[in-house]
Amino acid sequence: MAGNTIGQLFRVTTFGESHGLALGCIVDGVPPGIPLTEADLQHDLDRRRPGTSRYTTQRREPDQVKILSGVFEGVTTGTSIGLLIENTDQRSQDYSAIKDVFRPGHADYTYEQKYGLRDYRGGGRSSARETAMRVAAGAIAKKYLAEKFGIEIRGCLTQMGDIPLEIKDWSQVEQNPFFCPDPDKIDALDELMRALKKEGDSIGAKVTVVASGVPAGLGEPVFDRLDADIAHALMSINAVKGVEIGDGFDVVALRGSQNRDEITKDGFQSNHAGGILGGISSGQQIIAHMALKPTSSITVPGRTINRFGEEVEMITKGRHDPCVGIRAVPIAEAMLAIVLMDHLLRQRAQNADVKTHIPRW
């Protein structure tokens, strides 16, 4: 299976399955001399891990990360960093009934078509369990970006179902189980989740991720545009069906006189572009949004077929998230951090000596 690696200079390769012995990743390209401990990675892993609230899957995984290599006496050595998380709460028997059945809306059918077989236990490699390693690797990138460049990356839920959420107060995001920046909507979200659990159904969501303090000049002009790489990274997250940069699809209704981000001696007057112009960062906040579909792992009966082509009725058993968008927030932060760190290292490698007299704000 190819496609397990992201990045050029900062490279992250993950491995493992939902019900395997462990998950792991190799992180290449981390500069030497950076203070790094397992505790630095654990905070974001705890934000993502299952079983932390009644609104997410009740699979209880401690997600304790182990640093296997690349760190000596508390600092990075510049060599490959190996990370490992053991799986401890698998219930593979929950999936025995779907051994020969394709769950509608899942990767069961496509994996079988591609490989001729599949690991049916929790989706195997296609499970969002894999994203734990992305979060661990992303925590390294977030630490480097914050300490070396003052870059802050934050994410939040900005819509669940038909409930829009305004970014009113970033300080509230970590104070509720929804990563919600709009405290006035917490009760509505709680009511929706209770209804979904009662119905055995699920709902989609929108997640917004913002990077502040990103210097101008990151990104390449054509195929490796910064926004293209961000979109690629976010689209690689399980259940993501759409990505927007800045105003995204809303620009369709704007005129050029409205959409252009005018510049004065005091800086940009707007940020419809989401901090990226011509595939290169402008120095403004980088803003991206991603839409996540409602999970198909629900107890509402649905039609499908088995491996023998016979039509059957499907009811998903096991422990699942009614809204996968909730735990996707730290994953989105991690993927944005991975892309930004990769492009910072690439910019430093090629253009470290470039000096301009153009104002920067």
Curated annotation (Swiss-Prot):
<feature type="binding site">
    <location>
        <begin position="125"/>
        <end position="127"/>
    </location>
    <ligand>
        <name>FMN</name>
    </ligand>
</feature>
<keyword id="KW-0456">Lyase</keyword>
<dbReference type="GO" id="GO:0005829">
    <property type="term" value="C:cytosol"/>
</dbReference>
<feature type="binding site">
    <location>
        <position position="54"/>
    </location>
    <ligand>
        <name>NADP(+)</name>
    </ligand>
</feature>
<keyword id="KW-0028">Amino-acid biosynthesis</keyword>
<dbReference type="GO" id="GO:0009073">
    <property type="term" value="P:aromatic amino acid family biosynthetic process"/>
</dbReference>
<keyword id="KW-0274">FAD</keyword>
<dbReference type="GO" id="GO:0009423">
    <property type="term" value="P:chorismate biosynthetic process"/>
</dbReference>
<dbReference type="InterPro" id="IPR035904">
    <property type="entry name" value="Chorismate_synth_AroC_sf"/>
</dbReference>
<feature type="binding site">
    <location>
        <position position="319"/>
    </location>
    <ligand>
        <name>FMN</name>
    </ligand>
</feature>
<comment type="similarity">
    <text>Belongs to the chorismate synthase family.</text>
</comment>
<feature type="binding site">
    <location>
        <begin position="238"/>
        <end position="239"/>
    </location>
    <ligand>
        <name>FMN</name>
    </ligand>
</feature>
<dbReference type="InterPro" id="IPR000453">
    <property type="entry name" value="Chorismate_synth"/>
</dbReference>
<comment type="pathway">
    <text>Metabolic intermediate biosynthesis; chorismate biosynthesis; chorismate from D-erythrose 4-phosphate and phosphoenolpyruvate: step 7/7.</text>
</comment>
<comment type="subunit">
    <text>Homotetramer.</text>
</comment>
<dbReference type="GO" id="GO:0008652">
    <property type="term" value="P:amino acid biosynthetic process"/>
</dbReference>
<feature type="binding site">
    <location>
        <position position="48"/>
    </location>
    <ligand>
        <name>NADP(+)</name>
    </ligand>
</feature>
<feature type="binding site">
    <location>
        <position position="278"/>
    </location>
    <ligand>
        <name>FMN</name>
    </ligand>
</feature>
<keyword id="KW-0285">Flavoprotein</keyword>
<dbReference type="GO" id="GO:0004107">
    <property type="term" value="F:chorismate synthase activity"/>
</dbReference>
<dbReference type="InterPro" id="IPR020541">
    <property type="entry name" value="Chorismate_synthase_CS"/>
</dbReference>
<dbReference type="GO" id="GO:0010181">
    <property type="term" value="F:FMN binding"/>
</dbReference>
<keyword id="KW-0521">NADP</keyword>
<keyword id="KW-0288">FMN</keyword>
<keyword id="KW-0057">Aromatic amino acid biosynthesis</keyword>
<comment type="function">
    <text>This reaction introduces a second double bond into the aromatic ring system.</text>
</comment>
<dbReference type="Pfam" id="PF01264">
    <property type="entry name" value="Chorismate_synt"/>
</dbReference>
<feature type="binding site">
    <location>
        <begin position="293"/>
        <end position="297"/>
    </location>
    <ligand>
        <name>FMN</name>
    </ligand>
</feature>
<protein>
    <recommendedName>
        <fullName>Chorismate synthase</fullName>
        <ecNumber>4.2.3.5</ecNumber>
    </recommendedName>
</protein>
